Each structure stands twice: as C-alpha cells, then as structure tokens.
C-alpha cells in the first residue's frame, strides 16, 4: 500500500485551512504521475529521473520519518501538483542537542504563482519544524526571493556559502 511521506506527523503539518482549490499534503509515490518531477524541474533543471529512482529515493526519505517532510499543493480540480517544498530536521549537539529545520526545494508552478501557494507551503513546513522541536528554521535563497521569504516570517541573517561537486 502506498503511504504518504513521512506519516501522521506530516498529516498534522499539512492539515486544514487551504480552501477548496488546493490541498496541501505530504508527497505520495503516485505524485510522479501528477507532475512532481516537472515541478521540481522548474526550480532546478535536471536530467530525467526514472520511476525506479524516484521510488528508491521516496522510500529512503520515508525511512527518516518525521525528520524529512515533503509537502505538495494538489489542484483539487485537476489532480496536478501546483507547488512543493521540503523541510529536513538536523539534529545538533549545540543548544542542548537542539534541532534546526532546513527548508529546501520550494517551488510553485509558473501557472499557479501569485495565489499564495508558496507561502502556505512554507508556513506548513515551518510549523512542522516547530512541532519537531526545532529552535530555528533556515532557508538559503537567491536575493530575488528574500522578499517572499520575509512575507513568510524569515529575516536575513549571515551569509550563505557553497561548495559544489
């Protein structure tokens, strides 16, 4: 049987308040046929992913339980996905073995932008991280997106650096 990612904690994070047009819910295996990979490709163009590779990664993330949550916004009329985002909970030694939420891979389909879907997905991810006991939630973004994330309650802090392979 197909299970959403990751479980009941994800359902709590996704529940309520999104009206009739879109339902925000955890990622499911069947979402590969609802446009999930095409949606991610709008964020970061990538080579095609096979269904087998998608299934393997889905199962790997599901094994992490509530420490990794992928939410999607599903169009109630068409069943297609219009937005997605993820949060990963990092377990630390500092702050008395505290936890930090990392928001990643937030994307809204080009045809669905301007409807508040991105903000609703991000707010649900933040609430999930709060519920997991995170003392902060962070996101790295381009300068063009700082205004969007400010609307979601984030403030500019520090400098992001990266090393890509």
Curated annotation (Swiss-Prot):
Q: What is the topology of this protein in the membrane according to its UniProt annotation?
A: Peripheral membrane protein
Return the CDD domains for the record.
NAT_SF (cd04301)
Here the disulfide bonds are: none
Q: Does the keyword Endoplasmic reticulum apply?
A: yes
One GO cellular component from the entry? endoplasmic reticulum membrane
Q: In which tissues is it expressed?
A: Highly expressed in the root elongation zone and at lower levels in leaves and grains.
Protein EC: 2.3.1.4
Question: Which biological process annotations from GO are given for this protein?
Answer: N-acetylglucosamine biosynthetic process; root development; UDP-N-acetylglucosamine biosynthetic process
Enzyme class per UniProt = transferase
InterPro entries to which the protein is assigned, alphabetical: Acyl_CoA_acyltransferase, GNAT_dom, GNPNAT1-like
Task: Cite the GO molecular-function annotations of the record.
Answer: glucosamine 6-phosphate N-acetyltransferase activity
Q: What happens when the gene is disrupted?
A: Short roots, disruption of microtubules and shrinkage of cells in the root elongation zone.
List each copy of the N-acetyltransferase domain by range: 22-165
Pfam families associated with the record: Acetyltransf_1
SUPFAM superfamilies assigned to the protein according to its UniProt record, in alphabetical order: Acyl-CoA N-acyltransferases (Nat)
**Which compartments does it reside in?**
Endoplasmic reticulum membrane
Reaction(s) catalyzed by this protein?
D-glucosamine 6-phosphate + acetyl-CoA = N-acetyl-D-glucosamine 6-phosphate + CoA + H(+)
Superkingdom of origin organism:
Eukaryota
Binding of substrate: at which residues? 44, 92-95, 104-106, 135-136
Keywords, alphabetical: Acyltransferase, Endoplasmic reticulum, Membrane, Transferase
User: Which segment of the chain is annotated as a signal peptide?
Assistant: none
Q: Which PANTHER family match?
A: GLUCOSAMINE 6-PHOSPHATE N-ACETYLTRANSFERASE, GLUCOSAMINE 6-PHOSPHATE N-ACETYLTRANSFERASE 1
Subunit structure comment from the entry: Homodimer.
| Family statement drawn from the similarity comment of this UniProt entry | Belongs to the acetyltransferase family. GNA1 subfamily.
Summarize the protein's role. Answer: Acetyltransferase involved in de novo biosynthesis of UDP-N-acetylglucosamine (UDP-GlcNAc) in roots and is required for maintaining normal root cell shape. UDP-GlcNAc is an essential metabolite that serves as an initial sugar donor for N-glycan synthesis and thus plays an important role in protein and lipid glycosylation.
Which named protein is this?
Glucosamine 6-phosphate N-acetyltransferase 1
Q: Which organism is it from?
A: Oryza sativa subsp. japonica (Rice)
């Amino acid at each position: 049987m197909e299970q959403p990612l990751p479980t009941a904690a994800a359902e709590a994070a996704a529940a309520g308040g999104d009206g009739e047009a879109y339902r925000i819910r955890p990622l499911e295996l069947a979402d590969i046929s609802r446009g999930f990979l095409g949606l991610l490709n709008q964020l970061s163009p990538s080579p095609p992913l096979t269904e087998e590779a998608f299934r393997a990664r889905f199962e790997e993330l599901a094994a992490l339980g509530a420490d990794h949550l992928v939410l999607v916004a599903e169009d109630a009329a068409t069943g297609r996905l219009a937005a997605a985002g993820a949060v990963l909970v990092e377990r630390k030694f500092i702050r008395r073995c505290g936890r930090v939420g990392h928001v990643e891979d937030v994307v809204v389909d080009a045809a669905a932008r301007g409807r508040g879907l991105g903000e609703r997905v991000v707010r649900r991810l933040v609430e999930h991280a709060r519920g997991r006991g995170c003392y902060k939630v962070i996101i790295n973004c381009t300068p063009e997106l700082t205004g969007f994330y400010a609307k979601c309650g984030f403030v500019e802090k520090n400098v992001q650096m990266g090393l890509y392979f």
